[in-house]
């Protein structure tokens, strides 16, 4: 199990990225012709997800393309550096979460797509999402619900074009999802030698059953469509 010290370090690292992007936005605003324009703070931003969103709509000039390339490079370097600093146990947990969440996304792709499509028709803040997820997880202690939630939130992050909002959502939701139940599940699954079993992982996940996954789908859909 990760120590609280390590968890705080990871969160602080992500917060540094968040603050850096906010500073970039403020710097860009200072060079904008409309100097009266006030950029919204991350916590006040409203999420709008649309599966038809095309990144080319946001990259209309050569400067836009170059800025995106630089932003991607800097973000990737910082994330790669963070990964290199993580201990072996943390990396083993990353591998487990990758395997499990990829399987959920693949096996329940149709149900997940319904959730994503419904999310694209609504606007909501990161705190709306967090409150709903917190309610779901308090009422349900199963691993399936938590895996489905991680997969859903990750996909929302892919569809959200604003990096500040995405990091804000990931940071807050990681605290909510990683409750005692989820930590117990992951530490129980993780083998003592920190290797990932190839066959037992798939069979173990099948035992979770479709009920837990569909409950998360139902609850999230019910919230999205009001």
UniProtKB/Swiss-Prot annotation:
Signals that turn on the gene: Expressed in the early phase of the viral replicative cycle.
Organism: Vaccinia virus (strain Tian Tan) (VACV)
Functional description taken from the UniProt entry: Plays a role in evading host innate immune response by inhibiting host inflammasome activation. Interacts with and inhibits NLR-mediated interleukin-1 beta/IL1B production in infected cells. At the host mitochondria outer membrane, interacts with the BH3 domain of host BAK and prevents BAK from binding active BAX. In turn, host apoptosis is inhibited.
GO biological process, one term: symbiont-mediated suppression of host apoptosis
Protein name in the entry: Apoptosis regulator OPG045
Keywords assigned by UniProt, alphabetized: Host cytoplasm, Host membrane, Host mitochondrion, Host mitochondrion outer membrane, Host-virus interaction, Inhibition of host apoptosis by viral BCL2-like protein, Membrane, Modulation of host cell apoptosis by virus
Source taxonomy: Viruses, Varidnaviria, Bamfordvirae, Nucleocytoviricota, Pokkesviricetes
UniProt similarity note: Belongs to the orthopoxvirus OPG045 family.
Cross-referenced InterPro entries: Bcl-2-like_sf, Orthopox_F1, Poxvirus_F1/C10
Compartment(s) of residence: Host mitochondrion outer membrane; Host cytoplasm
Coiled-coil portions: none
Top-rank lineage group of the source organism: Viruses
Binding partners and assembly: Homodimer. Interacts with host pro-apoptotic protein BCL2L11 (via BH3 domain). Interacts with host NLRP1. Interacts with host BAK.
GO cellular component: host cell mitochondrial outer membrane; membrane
